[in-house]
């Protein structure tokens, strides 16, 4: 039998309880966006811009401003977060630094006005009104169901973690100095109006956050006001600053961000070590020792550089001919830290298998495909040097919504299964998404076929038709 990566409840496969069904609709929702699928959601989010146009002309290239005069969309945006929400959330135990920051831009520098310990709404409101401070609320999708719904769809669409922050800024004030981020940014204006100024990047597609002094950024490439219902996108590295104009009401905007450390360079760093390890098993040249005292050289000798270049060409040639799934810590990290499937409620209820137990003549189909990754790697349970490769299936069905995007200091668990490498073809049959009869799975025995189906069913990864 395959083994679980992490125990996830009762392992008695013959017993079942009603499955906790994921709900796709919020009751009495104001939503004017299309949540039918990740693709339809993103299409409705950037409407009237076509998706093809967005990725061809704007994504990672230049900002996109979408200004709308749509009262229903403006009302929906306003429903996503408000100052009254902040009052109710403070009663749940918010802390400075972890959940909220209070800050103001003074003389081109960020001044943090946080207190210690728990955040009280009256103190936050006092700083907001009297000190004209911006209140930054971290990762509101932990508390607001509709933001969970939005970001879960976006994580499915991009295949990358999606975070968010809410910024509440009083009139005549600015929270942050000019800076650029290491993420792709979508701005949704929820309440009031905000003046945005964007500048050409000094570091295109930046990998780090950085504050830029006013004398370095030049003149704005864009200067405009956002109003409720408007959407702004800009690539990582875009220098920006935003302020609420004097004489107007306060402003609230939502920042949705994605694609942090999600470049080709990151993927290469993630996959190259496994590739070298595999090829070194077959190529004795990679197992020969380095020249004596090479690590003691101040500079790398030319012959060593040529040797390394030759090894890299060998790796490239070997990579092109490989069809095997590459082990990837990026895959594991994504599924481990992303949001669970959206459902109404607090999101902490575990999902349990329900319905018919799959048998040899049953027809099964994969579910929650966007929440599952399949990868091949060495068996971590083997301590000997000759580790056998196994297939790992990781999923996010039992992830904790409350810890989403809260940093590495929060302990997270990884859920899933591991199977012998001989199961990979049968798993690919199921992963295509079409219904498949259990007895038609590409495995050697009927017992293996049924065990595979039951194991996936126990984790709610397949259902019986």
From Swiss-Prot:
Q: What is its main location?
A: nucleus
Q: Name one Pfam family in it.
A: ROXA-like_wH
Q: Where in the cell is it found?
A: Nucleus; Nucleus, Nucleolus
EC number of the protein: 1.14.11.79
Q: Which residues cross the membrane?
A: none
Instruction: Tell me which residues bear Phosphoserine.
Output: 309
Cofactor(s), by name: Fe(2+)
Binding of Fe cation: at which residues?
Answer: 179, 181, 240
Write down the Gene3D superfamilies for this protein, in alphabetical order: 3.90.930.40, Cupin (2.60.120.650), JmjC domain-containing ribosomal oxygenase (ROX), dimer domain (1.10.10.1500)
**Biological process, per Gene Ontology:** ribosome biogenesis
**Top-level division of the source organism's lineage:** Eukaryota
What terms describe the molecular function in GO for this protein?
histone H3K36 demethylase activity; histone H3K4 demethylase activity; identical protein binding; metal ion binding; peptidyl-histidine dioxygenase activity; transcription corepressor activity
Is the keyword Transport assigned to this protein? Answer: no
| Presence of the UniProt keyword Transmembrane in the record | no
Q: What class of enzyme is it?
A: oxidoreductase
Recorded hits in InterPro entries, A to Z, give: JmjC_dom (IPR003347), NO66-like (IPR039994), ROXA-like_wH (IPR046799)
Alphabetical GO CC annotations of the entry are: cytosol; nucleolus; nucleoplasm; nucleus; transcription regulator complex
The record's comment on protein family reads: Belongs to the ROX family. MINA53 subfamily.
Q: What does this protein do?
A: Oxygenase that can act as both a histone lysine demethylase and a ribosomal histidine hydroxylase. Is involved in the demethylation of trimethylated 'Lys-9' on histone H3 (H3K9me3), leading to an increase in ribosomal RNA expression. Also catalyzes the hydroxylation of 60S ribosomal protein L27a on 'His-39'. May play an important role in cell growth and survival. May be involved in ribosome biogenesis, most likely during the assembly process of pre-ribosomal particles.
- Descriptive protein name: Ribosomal oxygenase 2
Write down the species: Rattus norvegicus
